Amino acid sequence: MPLVPDPQHPGAFRIVLGGASQSWVDPARPEHLLFEYVVQLSLLFEHGLADVDPAERIRVIHIGGAGLSIPRWIAWRRPGTAQIVCEPDVGLTEEVRRKLPLPPRSGIKVRDVDGRSGVAVMPPDYADLVVLDAFDGARVPGELVTTEFLDELVR
């Protein structure tokens, strides 16, 4: 099973796929971010929304979900945010939901779809923010780093 308890942080788990840690989440403390790149993403989020009224509802699309640590953090930091997560690994999503359930009314909706297909069905100008955090092993899937996909994101 890809969810591995973290012995240093009771209640927290690593998501390990293909021998690599893909995500780390402590559902009781969503503000606790362990991976450095996730901390950096949180700083970008804070900076990018510094001028947006905290009461204003924003919409976020996540390409990749794993343990949903970034969506959980956003729901903690900015309650009321509407979030759609495109995560094609149905088995992983089911296990995460079973062992690490989302808080009630978190605003997080997980779609069992890859990022490219998920973004293609979104209305233009749907999202205020897109988080690309998808991996196939240690790499971002090639179809998510093309000029065509980036053009699709900005429509």
List the predicted regions and their residue ranges.
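Short Gly/aromatic-enriched secondary-structure transition segments
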Residues: 18-19, 30-31
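A short, flexible beta-alpha/helix-coil linker loop
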Residues: 20-24, 135-138
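N-terminal auxiliary segments of SAM/dcSAM-dependent transferases
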Residues: 1-18
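The AdoMet/dcAdoMet-binding core of the Class I SAM-like
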Residues: 9, 31-155
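Segments forming oxygen-rich coordination pockets for charged ligands
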Residues: 26-28
